[in-house]
Structure formats: C-alpha cells, structure tokens
C-alpha cells in the first residue's frame, strides 16, 4: 500500500534544497509559512539597516497559493508588488513499497 509524504523545498531563481519530508500536509504548510515569515522579517531588518530608518512590519507580505496537492508560499513587497526570489514549496508524493 502506498504511503503519501509531503516534501518541503526552499527554492530561489538559482538554487533549491529539500528542507524536510513530512507525513502531514498541514504540518509541512505550517513550516513553509514559518520559514517565509522569518525570511520576511529578515528582509525588513535589512531594509532598516540599509535606509537607516524604521520600516513597517507589514512591508513584506507572506502569500500562500494552494493548488490541490501542491502548495507554494512566497513573499511580496507590499508597495512594489514584486515577489521575492525565495519560495517554499510543498509537494505531495506517494512512496510505493517494493513488491518482492
């Protein structure tokens, strides 16, 4: 009997890496959202250092696209409406045991 698992990938325009494999889709989605939220805060703090001025907490917004078995979490700059290069992807896979 096949087992369903969910992989969490962190992807940029140039690289990608597997962050984990989960038995529960909701848990994988929560981790993806948490990673994106943490990265958005890092970007906000970098902006504060660059501009030497306070930057509003909601300047980078976390968005979730739920496409049936796949989920994409990404960050957009609120005013520029541009997506940030990092994306967190949750993909569903079935593991089929070897029938020997």
Residue spans for each PLM region:
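Short, flexible beta-strand-to-coil junctions
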Residues: 9-15, 23-24, 65-67, 79-80
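Short, mixed-charge low-complexity intrinsically disordered segments
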Residues: 37-100
């Amino acid at each position: 009997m096949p087992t369903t698992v969910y992989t969490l990938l962190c992807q940029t325009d140039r690289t990608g890496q597997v962050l984990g494999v989960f038995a529960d889709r909701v848990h994988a989605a929560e981790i993806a959202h948490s990673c994106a939220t943490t990265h958005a805060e890092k970007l906000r703090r970098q902006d504060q250092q660059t501009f030497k001025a306070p930057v509003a907490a909601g300047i980078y917004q976390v968005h979730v696209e739920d496409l049936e078995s796949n989920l994409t979490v990404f960050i957009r700059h609120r005013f520029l409406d541009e997506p940030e290069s990092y994306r967190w992807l949750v993909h569903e896979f079935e593991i089929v045991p070897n029938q020997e």
